[in-house]
């Protein structure tokens, strides 16, 4: 697989700002280090893991931003939009229904499973709910 187009911290801040302005919530960053960690984890998986297709990388991003609680509010929404944006800039479109998206990201936020299991579950769901642009 060729190296994907990555998101950066400015992209994440922009996504969060837009989410809060459109759908409400408390603005603010809880921990900038968690944002960097969530961004770097996907790159680490790409460079050092055999399981690094675009869907798994999107799931790593989604998991990181949902579970790391980087922001005061909007973490699930940021996680979803990071997945959507990352897929989009790499030639894929998430086509799941709004109800499915809400269910999957709410379940992810509440999950107590292992990180590896949750990422694989999310990656499989993304794989089944995308199409090339």
Kindly label every feature range from the protein language model.
Residues 1-133:
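FIC/Doc superfamily catalytic core
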């Amino acid at each position: 697989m060729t190296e994907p187009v990555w998101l950066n911290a400015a992209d994440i801040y922009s996504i969060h700002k837009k989410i809060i302005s459109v759908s409400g919530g408390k603005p603010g960053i809880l921990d900038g280090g968690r944002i960097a960690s969530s961004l770097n984890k996907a790159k680490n998986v790409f460079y050092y893991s055999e399981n690094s297709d675009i869907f798994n990388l999107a799931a790593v991003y989604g998991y990181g931003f949902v579970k790391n609680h980087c922001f005061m509010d909007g973490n699930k929404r940021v996680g979803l939009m990071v997945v959507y944006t990352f897929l989009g800039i790499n030639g894929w479109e998430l086509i799941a229904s709004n109800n499915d998206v809400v269910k999957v990201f709410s379940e992810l936020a509440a999950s107590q499973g292992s990180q590896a299991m949750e990422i694989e579950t999310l990656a499989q769901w993304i794989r089944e709910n995308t199409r090339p642009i």
